[in-house]
């Protein structure tokens, strides 16, 4: 069994790390490079960087900080934000990214997933999915352009259909960003994760809702996810990564040791 991964997420806007609640009202957390170094030293297994307004602004991720990150950390990192072409991806890999993640551009053109996977290998291509639970209908919908709350829109895709589609197109990993839970710190949506796990053959990463160490444990044990991504609990120093890993080991969860 592969070891479970702990993944701090750094949302980037205008060159700084920010964090919102349910993808809204973002506050500045700090500078990118020192935070990346801090999490790498704390024992993170990998890092994810989202240039959150790149897609909605019609641009690609700001590459200047990608190269700086690659120079100062020695753990894998994934970069997302407005990647629409093979050339966009090539530049990010050249600057040192280990993986790229696509979200809104994949919804606009699902063949992008296949083209990227064919060129760089499925192991390097992550698809991010921003899901919203609609209380009235009990359905999970996929949203697009969520980095800018004024442009966020619901797509015609229901969650499980899109999960199946991106796998057929060549996604090597899926990060499920559960928007209803984002930033609330009251736990991952285990019911949603279990539904997705049932149709997901590739590594599945939970995102949105971590507030306590037990939330990570529950996602790994109950929903059988491969990794857990979190932001505010790490940014606000509510949970320290080393302590979290020790806790998970005591819960009989296989974790990558330092």
Curated annotation (Swiss-Prot):
One of its GO terms (molecular function) is imidazoleglycerol-phosphate synthase activity. Pfam families: His_biosynth. InterPro entries: Aldolase_TIM, His_biosynth, HisF, IGPS_HisA/HisF, RibuloseP-bd_barrel. Its EC number is 4.3.2.10. It comes from the Bacteria. Keywords: Amino-acid biosynthesis, Cytoplasm, Histidine biosynthesis, Lyase. The keyword Cytoplasm applies. GO terms for cellular component: cytoplasm. It catalyses: 5-[(5-phospho-1-deoxy-D-ribulos-1-ylimino)methylamino]-1-(5-phospho-beta-D-ribosyl)imidazole-4-carboxamide + L-glutamine = D-erythro-1-(imidazol-4-yl)glycerol 3-phosphate + 5-amino-1-(5-phospho-beta-D-ribosyl)imidazole-4-carboxamide + L-glutamate + H(+). It is found in: Cytoplasm. The keyword Cytoplasm applies. GO terms for biological process: L-histidine biosynthetic process. The active site is at 11, 130. Pathway: Amino-acid biosynthesis; L-histidine biosynthesis; L-histidine from 5-phospho-alpha-D-ribose 1-diphosphate: step 5/9. IGPS catalyzes the conversion of PRFAR and glutamine to IGP, AICAR and glutamate. The HisF subunit catalyzes the cyclization activity that produces IGP and AICAR from PRFAR using the ammonia provided by the HisH subunit. Belongs to the HisA/HisF family. PANTHER family: IMIDAZOLE GLYCEROL PHOSPHATE SYNTHASE HISHF, IMIDAZOLE GLYCEROL PHOSPHATE SYNTHASE SUBUNIT HISF/H IGP SYNTHASE SUBUNIT HISF/H. Heterodimer of HisH and HisF. This is Imidazole glycerol phosphate synthase subunit HisF. It comes from Haemophilus influenzae (strain PittEE).
């Amino acid at each position: 069994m592969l070891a479970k991964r702990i993944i701090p997420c750094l949302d980037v806007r205008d060159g700084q790390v920010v964090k919102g609640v349910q993808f809204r009202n973002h506050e500045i957390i700090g500078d990118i490079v020192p935070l990346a170094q801090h999490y790498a030293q704390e024992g993170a297994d990998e890092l994810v960087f989202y240039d959150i307004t790149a897609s909605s602004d019609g641009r690609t991720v700001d590459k200047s900080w990608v190269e700086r990150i690659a120079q100062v950390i020695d753990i894998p990192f994934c970069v997302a934000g407005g990647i629409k072409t093979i050339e966009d991806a090539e530049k990010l890999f050249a600057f040192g990214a280990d993986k790229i993640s696509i979200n809104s551009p994949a919804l606009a053109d699902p063949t992008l997933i296949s083209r990227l996977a064919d060129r760089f290998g499925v192991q390097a291509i992550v698809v991010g999915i921003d899901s919203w639970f609609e209380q009235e209908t009990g359905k999970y919908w996929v949203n697009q352009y969520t980095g800018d709350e004024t442009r966020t829109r619901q797509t015609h895709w229901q969650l499980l259909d899109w999960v199946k589609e991106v796998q057929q197109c060549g996604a090597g990993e899926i990060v499920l960003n559960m928007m209803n839970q984002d930033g609330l710190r009251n736990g991952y949506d285990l019911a949603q994760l279990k539904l997705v796990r049932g149709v997901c053959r590739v590594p599945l990463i939970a995102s949105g809702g971590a507030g306590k160490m037990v939330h990570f444990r529950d996602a790994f044990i109950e929903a059988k996810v491969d990794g857990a991504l979190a932001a505010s609990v790490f940014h606000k120093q509510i949970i320290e990564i080393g302590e979290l890993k020790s806790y998970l080991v005591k819960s009989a969860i296989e974790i990558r040791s330092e």
